[in-house]
């Protein structure tokens, strides 16, 4: 049997260096190969449902960062679906800066480690209670 938690870690590692421009939700082109790899891992996982959790650094307001992290995680899901991942296998959620560790005053390069997407394997019993994404319908984020 395939260890889905281990696969979640592999997917997360593949997505570790997916880069976004500051304050934007669009994935930068140099990150496309990482998305290709993550998509391959998910497609070979023989089922398995994965929650992609977006995180931001501490710069900006809590509310703004929460919205941005939601948009970024949803964008990664969209990019993976474009690469053939079954939409029923992936969902997204944003955490904003809740788990950011680097100070707001640190350099952009230092804060980069807080801007990431985490991947969690979710059991079927829990999966149905999680929405596809947590983006409020009225909110518009710059692309």
Model-predicted regions and their roles:
Residues 1-49, 108-109, 122-143:
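Periplasmic peptidoglycan-binding/tethering modules of Gram-negative envelope proteins
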Residues 3-4, 9, 60-61, 67, ...:
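Short leucine-rich amphipathic alpha-helices used at interfaces
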Residues 12-23, 35-73, 79, 87-104:
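Short, surface-exposed beta-strand segments enriched in small/polar/acidic residues
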Residues 48, 74, 78-143:
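Periplasmic OmpA/Pal-like peptidoglycan-binding modules at the C-termini of bacterial envelope proteins
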